[in-house]
C-alpha cells in the first residue's frame, strides 16, 4: 500500500518572520489539499496527513518545481501574499504539492533540502 504525503516548498530568498512563514505554509497546505482527488485526500488523512517543508533558492526554482509537479499530475497551489504586513502584495511565497502518493511527489522533490 502506498503512503501519501504533502510537500510545502518555501523560498530561501525571502526573509520572513517565523509567524509569516508559518501562515504561508498553512495557506499552501490547505490550498493544495483542496486540489487533490477525493481518494488521495482521504488516504492522506487516514495516514496521518504527513507534511514535509522544503526549500528552494529562488522564485524561478519555485516556478520550475510547479511545472514539474504539473507534468506528474500532482495538485499544486502557489501562494501569493496579500501584502498587509511584511512583504509587497502579490509576492509569491510558497508552493504546496499534494497530497498524493509519496513516490510520485518524490520524483519532483527528492533533491530539495529540508527547511
Curated annotation (Swiss-Prot):
Keyword Hydrolase: yes
Alphabetized InterPro entries for the sequence: Pep_tRNA_hydro_II_dom_sf, Pept_tRNA_hydro_arch, PTH2
GO cellular component terms, A-Z: cytosol
Family annotation (Gene3D superfamilies): Bit1
Key words of the record: Cytoplasm, Hydrolase
Reactions listed under catalytic activity: an N-acyl-L-alpha-aminoacyl-tRNA + H2O = an N-acyl-L-amino acid + a tRNA + H(+)
GO molecular-function term, one example from the UniProt record: peptidyl-tRNA hydrolase activity
Compartment list: Cytoplasm
Major location category of this protein: cytoplasm
Gene Ontology biological process terms in this record: translation
EC number: 3.1.1.29
Task of the protein: The natural substrate for this enzyme may be peptidyl-tRNAs which drop off the ribosome during protein synthesis.
Family to which this protein belongs: Belongs to the PTH2 family.
HAMAP family xrefs: Pept_tRNA_hydro_arch
Name recorded for this polypeptide: Peptidyl-tRNA hydrolase
Gene: pth
